[in-house]
C-alpha cells in the first residue's frame, strides 16, 4: 500500500474522531473528496428534485470532475489534518 493510500485510509478513520462536527459545507467537501478519491468522476443519475441532501452531495462530487483520484485523496488527507488541528 502506498503512503498516499495509507494516509487516505488513516484520514477516513480520523474523520470519525474529530473534536467538533464540521459545518455542512465542510462535510460536503469531505464527502465529495472521498467519493472522487475512491470512485473517480461522478456517475449515475442525479437524485430527484426533492432529495435535497442527495442532490447537494451529487453536485459537490460533480464539481470535482476531472480531478485524479490521487489528487482527491491527498486533498482529503490535507483537509482532515486541518480539521484535526
Q: What is each residue range found by the language model?
A:
Residues 1-85:
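A charge-rich, low-complexity, intrinsically flexible signal that marks solvent-exposed coils, linkers
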